[in-house]
Amino acid sequence: MSTKGRGIFPFSKIKLMLASPDDIRSWSHGEVKRPETLNYRTLKPEKDGLFCAKIFGPTKDYECLCGKYRGKRYEGKICEKCGVEVTSSYVRRERFGHIELAAPVVHIWFLKSTPSKIGTLLNLTSRDVERVAYFESYLVIEYPNEEEEEKFEKEEGTIPLNDGISTKWVKLHVVNEEEFEEKYAFSIDEKYEYGMGAEILKEVLSKIDLEAYSKKLKELVKPYSLGFEDLGREVAEKYKNLYQKLVKVIADDFRAYGVELKGLEDKGLTLEQAIHRIITEELYLNVETGEVEFEDCGDNCLTGREALRVYYEKVREHKRDIPIFEKIKEDVRTAVLREVSEARIRKALRILQLVEGFKKSGNRPEWMILEVLPVIPPELRPLVALDGGRFATSDLNDLYRRVINRNNRLKRLIELSAPDIIIRNEKRMLQEAVDALIDNGKRGNPVKQNGRPLKSLADYLKGKQGRFRQNLLGKRVDYSGRSVIVVGPELQMHQCGLPKIMALELFKPFVYRRLEEKGYATSIKHAKKLVEQKTPEVWECLEEVVKQHPVLLNRAPTLHRPSIQAFEPVLVEGKAIQLHPLVCPPFNADFDGDQMAVHVPLGIEAQLESYILMLSTQNILSPAHGKPLTMPSQDMVLGTYYMTHDPIPGRKGEGKAFTSYEEVIKALELGHVDIHAKIKFKVGKEWIETTPGRVLFNSIMPEGQPFVNETLDKKRLSKLITNLYIAVGNEETVKFLDRVKELGFLRSTLAGISIGIDDLQVPKVKEKIIKEALKKTEEIWNQYVQGIITNKERYNRIIDVWSEATNAVSKAMFEEIEHSTEIRNGKEYPGTFNPIYMMAVSGARGNRDQIRQLAGMRGLMAKHSGEFIETPIISNFREGLSVLEYFISTYGARKGLADTALKTAFAGYLTRRLVDVAQDITITEKDCGTVKGFEMEPIVEAGEERVPLKDRIFGRVLAEDVKDPYTGEVIAKRNEVVDEKLAERIARAGIEKVKVRSPLTCEAKHGVCAMCYGWDLSQRKIVSVGEAVGIIAAQSIGEPGTQLTMRTFHIGGAATAQKVQSFVKTESEGTVKFYNVKFIVNRKGEKINVSKDAAIGVLDEKGRLLERHTIPYGARLLVDEGQKVKAGTKLADWDPFNTYIIAEVGGKIELRDIILDVTVREERDVITGKTATVVSFMRPKDAMLHTPRIAVITEDGKEYVYDLPVNAILNIPADKLTLEWRICPTCSESEETTIQHQYYVVKELEVQPGDILARIPKETAKVRDIVGGLPRVEELFEARKPKNPAILSEIDGYVKIYEDADEVIVFNPRTGETKKYAIKKDELILVRHGQYIKKGQKITETKVAEIDGQVRIKGRGFKVIVYNPETGLQREYFVPKGKFLLVKEGDYVKAGDPLTDGTPVPEEILRIKGIEELEKFLLKEVQMVYKLQGVDINDKHFEIIIRQMLKKVRIIDPGDSRFLVGEEVDKEELEEEIQRIKLEGGKLPKAEPVLVGITRAALSTRSWISAASFQETTRVLTDASVEGKIDELRGLKENVIIGNLIPAGTGVDEYKEVDVIPAEEKVLEEKPQSSEEETS
């Protein structure tokens, strides 16, 4: 280890290794031979026992056991009588003992962890090794005789053993007793060795020749990093099987792209043989003509793999295609990688990794078997005497006693040379005893005592109660206390009230010192006495000590950084801590019995840091989004709102003019003017109209700020505070906040606002609205009864009607309140002074929804499943609920409480994973100098802009110059920080994309650089080096999750359905532009959109895009392209409840495979008696045999076929439909008998373009809350595959859709003749199901119809082919039935576009579109979940987590690196290795990025200490010890665990050199009241 330490330790790295038996003996101070602990009479430790003083040290300080030597002067002496060394009893916490085991024992971690390390190394299954270790089976080693040596070496699964002379490859067999007796027991052949138990395993492990093993395995996996460039004779000879597969891949590609080799037939060669012989340089290829020659024929004749490439590109050029040879290279590589994923190769790679681990680390395999067992120091497994003569002991002592007892018994049996079977049994029991000690319950049943499993060594490490999480990461500290909090409105913002008795206890040592200094006490003892008596001098000293000494307050749960802040204590009477009301929001504290903890920072550095960094006045802004956290709330907001309210006409003092604040305030106090009167006031040189209340508010504003002349509610107040912070800085803002608090409280008190039941005004129109709604629902029921709409539609429409009614009542209620007047205190007030209204509108308490429930109507309630209960609650709380209504509403209320309990845990666990994955990301340097960046654009969802560009680039550093797109002038330069002004300017210039620097593209070696991170949002300046941005990111994402889950029950389950959007309106004036709009005109002359990705934009006169709206398929367009529109014009509307299948051409209709009770069912509604024909397959088999479709046949005989997905409802008039019995050829054929079905047939029916053929009802409306959202966040961060994945196109190209089936049947209904055609896997079917074809028409490229007839296809689904004529690339996708296709024949798609519905799989996006698109996708998806909840989190926090998910790469070709093919390594490690190989000159490794979920990323971090303390402790430690992993102690977690300063904040190396010189007392006294220092 290097001696240069980190923090307080003389080392900078920690390496984990396996301990050899000699290591264990060297740690030990003696062997423990007896299981005894303490003597029951003398209570002294027994000699040679588990607590032996001779081995572990004296029980009393500086005193031997027999008492002969006592006192410090004998230190180091060993007593002759009892053999105990005289020293401090502390050594009993650090001295080890050991137990010499009578027989070797397998360490269970290396036997039972998955995959088993010993099993992997010996190439045996875990179960086999276990059977050997527990004496159930024999391990037989088969050595080769001389003839077999070479054969054994080549065979897979053999193992090299070195007996000290030579290395032989042997086979291992695990056989049971019977087989052993039969085959090997009496064999005189010398080639077999055998044994049982850990002994034989140890023997084999100690002989393994790691070098030879590694060499063989490397040879085995070497071909799997081959590419086209490596093909040649050597490869052909060495790796026959793989090579043949690759030749076939090349041949297939040549055929597919029409590249022919000529002259093969005369020479009797197949294409594969020719390619093979060209690659191995046995044949020549004329690259001009394509002739294959036996001899060299001059310049044009080439041989080897290059010949194929040159010829291929020449041919493609003649065909006017782009000559892409990359495609063949890619296919070869894909074929190789497919082989890698084979189990055999994966296994070889796993063994190789383990062998390399042992080689590199210097561990020996036989050390996984224990000969000596260490005994941990006795003070770490204490035995405590309780009163009543009983003892409480650690479980470990019991486990050790079992081991010692069994070990001693085994020794005795071996000395007595007992029968083999007894010894074997005893050895097995010893093995089990050691297993229980190391990891109880890992194998078989755990050892129990009084029905409770004993805690083994592993249990002391793992889980929440283990050493890592309980004692190392979550220590309890002294100088702390906790108490209930109460509000302290008279405090200043940097103060808190600390109870005197509490302060006295916390500051005791300081008080003692002060008492001595002032001469009140002569000694510490005296001072103690004074403090106990609590004399007046004590309180005097306490006051002095506490002054200027900050304390930290913390409220659990500590969800983010502002949950711990520093305050200056003010001593108060009583026992409750007083908290300033403004700092409640960051703590999320209220005063209904919350408790808080107090901590005292002791050191001078700690006090300074508390003052400068943690003081509450320094934490006004949130690190998550940069908006103020410290906010006036409740009464303060109400008071401010009340006094800045609009003027009331006709009040006392109206029209008076004032010139100064003092005049107004005096007039107000004397009652000459009413607070809401309209007065004139002089601001600067201008006169303005305002009210005395607003003048009063402006009198507390910082100087030089513009006059605020508006009604201030919570939102405006927040905006005002943000603007002030920008304008006047921290200190002035804090002072202002304190003044707002005072004034707000005062004014709300003087206003005397209170609420009475009369303030809840039930709107007069409520009855009318409800009558109308009831009428509408009745109509909907009638339509349903008549069968015009389906049950699902009925449900959706009813929900919609009630949502609208609820909103209407609520709107009416607020309007009535606003327009009414009331007499209060003899004065007339407008309705906006209604106290409840004021509370809601100002944002002081409650919201419109809650008032709606109090005085409007409660509205719709949600069920557990998230659906709405159809019957709304019509009453409100003022009128009271009926029994039924009360019963319905218990539903939602209970759901709220149940959710809260479950989801808090879920969100907490998510936060923990996020912290663990990002904990080691800190700001490590000022600027990494990268030129890369991340493109920011507005987030648009469903056609509306959810997050504007200016919000996304705010606080970021530009990656390149930003130019005005119209004038070309440079608005901002690279590396400039974007503040509000600049963001606004960029947005105004109409720029749509801006490249900013991002943690995702940062090139800092460890962590992130300050420029790529941008602003520290809580300080509004570039982040300082050392900031722990990873943890801040995790907290910023996790905290709202926890908050949101806690928020559901406040509305009491009264759900609000999101109003369904059924049209789009313009927001601005301009000219209409269509994007991808394809429309047809229907019978009514309306334009119907039939494009799947259409959008309508509005441009201004310069042609700049102002807005863009997506338009769904089937929408009615209400404007024309190029039309001028005003703001508020409707552009398009559609039916929000259904998706339509629309006839795009006119013609006759034919139904195909629409068979009653087979492919469609008649849904007859019990209530309505009407029927609807709905597509649904009765049996899964039917879906294979039939494909329901509607065909429209035009006059010129062209067919347009529309597939009907499941749940589609036919839209054909009932009188045009008849049922006919017909023979079904497909079913008859599959059941091998004649089967008839009832087919639906359409009588003469012509459709016009735009007619609706069928409709698919949409999913029902559900309540969307983050609870639905949190699992989505988890799905994204864990990189899980979504439940319904979308199929994405991998290339750009045109879509072709074919049926996918094994056979095509042509059936002639007139003659009854049937012909079958078997279809090969790679053939494309050129006809559609149900189509009528003529004899001679092609069915596939090779098969032709032999009869006229109708086509029948037993379809599995579709083959969707994307073909790119330019590159010649083609990809095919299988789409199963029931998945909805988003593309049509002939559509053009881009790589990464979805072909079917569903959620895109992140890994697919990474593979197809690359890392940048994936980053954009993840960022947008996860932001949307939070945005739907109205939660603001800055992008950079998500970016840091996404950076961690993408920090690994998978090695495709190891080159000359130390990596293996398929291994996943950190980008950093790969970079280091590349640099090394560049210096030495060798083949560089190639890798591809992989996406890793946060749990896996946290477990595979380079720091084993951090991973072990996260999850799966056993596995992490086992892996780390075998590989001899080194922890560099870079992250925060590992440093906390070993007790070091963390490498963040002031713990960064840069600050190491800074020393704090304790100033004289005098200087300390003059410290300023509130913190004015800026962060250094």
UniProtKB/Swiss-Prot annotation:
Its EC number is 2.7.7.6. GO terms for cellular component: DNA-directed RNA polymerase complex. Keywords: DNA-directed RNA polymerase, Magnesium, Metal-binding, Nucleotidyltransferase, Transcription, Transferase, Zinc. Binds 1 Mg(2+) ion per subunit. Binds 2 Zn(2+) ions per subunit. GO terms for biological process: DNA-templated transcription. CDD domains: RNAP_beta'_C, RNAP_beta'_N. Zn(2+) 1 binds at residues 64, 66, 79, 82. Zn(2+) 2 binds at residues 928, 1002, 1009, 1012. InterPro entries: DNA-dir_RpoC_beta_prime (IPR045867), DNA-dir_RpoC_beta_prime_bact (IPR012754), RNA_pol_asu (IPR000722), RNA_pol_N (IPR006592), RNA_pol_Rpb1_1 (IPR007080), RNA_pol_Rpb1_3 (IPR007066), RNA_pol_Rpb1_3_sf (IPR042102), RNA_pol_Rpb1_4 (IPR007083). Mg(2+) binds at residues 590, 592, 594. GO terms for molecular function: DNA binding; DNA-directed RNA polymerase activity; magnesium ion binding; zinc ion binding. It catalyses: RNA(n) + a ribonucleoside 5'-triphosphate = RNA(n+1) + diphosphate. Its cofactor is Mg(2+); Zn(2+). SMART domains: RPOLA_N. Belongs to the RNA polymerase beta' chain family. DNA-dependent RNA polymerase catalyzes the transcription of DNA into RNA using the four ribonucleoside triphosphates as substrates. HAMAP family: RNApol_bact_RpoC. The RNAP catalytic core consists of 2 alpha, 1 beta, 1 beta' and 1 omega subunit. When a sigma factor is associated with the core the holoenzyme is formed, which can initiate transcription. This is DNA-directed RNA polymerase subunit beta'. It comes from Aquifex pyrophilus.
